[in-house]
């Protein structure tokens, strides 16, 4: 399995269990059939730059543990899987890197994802949650094309990279 297994975090004397952020494979039904989706989570899912929590380093990046993001991360898998049938994602290409991303907006939540089909696989996708947080009243989301989430997953599984 790909992805990082995040260790538990101790921040200001409080222990935070990170086991819910371990990579896991889930089965989803789409119009084109059953898909296996491996969901993994990035560093920004439980950290921010505000400096209110314990400083944490990952690779060359330093951020701070964020209790609000951590609490929101506990239901990320369920929210993502629940959105497959009927919700929309916005597809966009990041200006600086040219990387294709998708964001899922559920109520006030912003969930930024990469969705990839590993070469040589059928019926399997890797969905990496890059970041997830609640938008404040000034929050802006990247503009792009709104597409049914289920359609995007089906097309990515079929090898289409232009969505």
Where are these regions (language model features)?
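Ribonuclease/tRNase effector modules and their secretory precursors
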Residues: 1-163
């Amino acid at each position: 399995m790909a992805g990082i297994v995040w260790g538990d975090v101790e921040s200001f004397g409080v222990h935070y269990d990170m086991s819910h952020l371990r990579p896991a494979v889930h089965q989803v039904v789409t119009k084109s059939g059953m898909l296996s989706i491996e969901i993994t989570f990035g560093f920004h899912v439980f950290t921010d730059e505000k400096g209110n929590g314990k400083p944490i380093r990952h690779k060359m990046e330093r951020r701070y543990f964020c209790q609000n993001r951590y609490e929101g991360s506990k239901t990320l898998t369920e929210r993502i899987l629940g959105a497959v049938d009927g919700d929309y994602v916005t597809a966009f290409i990041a200006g600086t890197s040219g990387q294709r991303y998708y964001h899922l907006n559920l109520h006030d939540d912003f969930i930024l994802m990469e969705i990839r089909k590993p070469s040589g696989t059928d019926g399997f996708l890797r969905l990496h949650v890059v970041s997830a947080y609640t938008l404040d009243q000034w929050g802006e989301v990247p503009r792009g094309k709104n597409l049914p989430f289920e359609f995007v997953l089906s097309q990515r599984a079929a090898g289409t990279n232009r969505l």
